[in-house]
Amino acid sequence: GDCHKFLGWCRGEKDPCCEHLTCHVKHGWCVWDGTI
C-alpha cells in the first residue's frame, strides 16, 4: 500500500505503515499524531 496516501489500519493486526505512527483510537487508522 501507499503509506503516504493511506497510512493503514491499526485494528487488530497492525499495518506495516503504522510502525512509527500513532493509532487513531476513534477511527482505527494510523495518523502522524493523535490530534486529528
Swiss-Prot record:
Tissue expression per record: Expressed by the venom gland.
Q: Name one GO molecular function term.
A: ion channel inhibitor activity
Q: Which UniProt keywords apply?
A: Amidation, Disulfide bond, Ion channel impairing toxin, Pharmaceutical, Potassium channel impairing toxin, Secreted, Toxin, Voltage-gated potassium channel impairing toxin
Under InterPro entries, the record lists: Huwentoxin-1 (IPR011696)
* Record localization: Secreted
Q: Which residues carry this modification: Isoleucine amide?
A: 36
Q: What are the disulfide bonds?
A: 3-18, 10-23, 17-30
Which positions are tagged coiled coil?
none
* Lineage: superkingdom: Eukaryota
Query: What Gene Ontology cellular-component terms does the record carry?
Result: extracellular region
Q: What else is known?
A: Weakly inhibits Nav1.2/SCN2A (IC(50)=1449 nM), Nav1.7/SCN9A (IC(50)=1528 nM), Nav1.5/SCN5A (IC(50)=7316), and Kv11.1/KCNH2/ERG1 (IC(50)=8511 nM).
The job of this chain, per UniProt, is described as: Selective inhibitor of voltage-gated potassium channel Kv10.1/KCNH1/EAG1 (IC(50)=637 nM). It acts by shifting the voltage dependence of channel activation in a depolarising direction. It shows a 100% inhibition at saturating concentrations, shows fast on-rates and is reversible. It also slightly affects channel inactivation, when the membrane is highly depolarised (>+80 mV).
UniProt-recorded name of the protein: Kappa-theraphotoxin-Aa1a
